[in-house]
Each structure stands twice: as structure tokens, then as C-alpha cells.
Amino acid sequence: ERLLFARARMALSWAVAALGLWPGDVVLVPAYVTGSAVAPLLWAGLQLQPYAVNPATLEPHWPMLSVMARAARPRALLLVHYFGFPSDPNAARAFCDRHGLLLLEDCAHSLLTRHGGHPWGSHGDAAFYSLRKLLPLPDGGLLRLRFAGPGRLLPPPLQTSAAALLPLLLRQAAQALGCRPALRRAAAIRPVVADEVRLSEPARGIHPWSLRLLRRLALPAARERRRANYRELSQRLAEVPGI
């Protein structure tokens, strides 16, 4: 089952409901993670138990997780594939099967990553991806479910208003025109009253504009372009002292 959303975190919200996670259920999450990545779990009333990751490899600390799985009685494990580099999904799948947990794969940066002929996210009970972070789209998130219960999972409500894309389009335009640093400086002088993550966020489908663009994209070419950009950046950073 695959569904398209406006944001990857909306896909995670949908997965929480589809997999039958309830308020009060415990989810093991990495201690190294952004607030927006786990916000849907908090919105659903789930209890988050952070686990350590190896600072060198960013792989989960499996011995610690084994202790936590016995003590906290969790329902699910969130596995993050950081920066497009995959964590070991085979180890995660085996761990979850051994302890009777659902496996949620955060593939926000791993949309175009494959291993052994399969895309990352194939091992989890649910995997969510960010389209707009890796492709030239105004919005877009993808949910892949191995099992969604009886019957087909209902798609999210469509968004058709152009106003829904306006903030993203303005931000992308500012970046293209070189105005992003000035905007950040202007925002820095305003008092911070809340995190960027809202108290709740209703799930909505990908915008039709983004969907039309997505259907026109050559994904293999986009993957190779991303890899070429990474190699170029890595080579240039290698020449910078202290990095």
C-alpha cells in the first residue's frame, strides 16, 4: 500500500493510525532525531523512549535496545536512515520480530536509495519518505505500508488550493534569489514562542501541481544527479582544513 501526502510527517501520522498504535503505547526512538520527525508520534499520544546510537556509524545500540524492549514493553521501533545512508534494516527487522515490535522506517532522506535491488523501507511495517527534500517539488511525502489491516487504506484528503503551496514557493524563490540569509537574520530578531512543529497537523494529500511534476520527473537521472552533487561536495570539503 502506497499513499502520497503533502509532508512526510503526515505519512507517519497516517501510519500510526493504520498500524493500530494507541495513546500511551511506547515507541523506541533514536536520541539523535529532529523534533519534526517524532512530532506525529507525540500528536498521537504515544510515549517516546529514546535509545542511543553509535556516534560513528549512527547505528542503533542494539544491546541497550534489548534491555529497553524487555523493560518498557514497547509497541514499535523507529529506525532512522540518516542523510541517505541506511542503517542496517535486516538487524532492525530481526530485532522487531524477536521482540514482537512494529518497525517504522524514517526514509525522509533515502527516497532514491536502493540495496540488493530493493528500495530502503522495504523491511519496515511502515516507511515514510520526503519527496520535496530530494526532488524539485513544492511538497510531497510518501507512505509505504506492508499491512494496513482489513480492506484498503483510505487516501488522505486532497488539497487543491494554490495558497497551500504559497509558503513553500516563496521560500524556494527567496533561496533561488539569494535572499535566504537576509530572511533568516530578520527572523532571528523575533521572539521565539514555539517550536517549528505545530501542536497538531491534519494530514492532507500531495498537491496536484506536485503530482503532475512528479509524473514528469526521470527518477534515475535525479538519483545520479544527487550522487554527483554529493561527490562534488565531499571532494570540496575534503580540501577544507579542519573537516
Listing of model-derived features with the role each one plays in the protein:
Residues E1-A15, V29-A31, Y51:
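Short loop-beta-helix segment that forms the pyridoxal 5′-phosphate
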Residues A17-C107, L111:
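PLP-dependent aminotransferase-like
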Residues V67-R73, N90, H115, A126, ...:
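Conserved PLP-enzyme active-site core in the AAT-like
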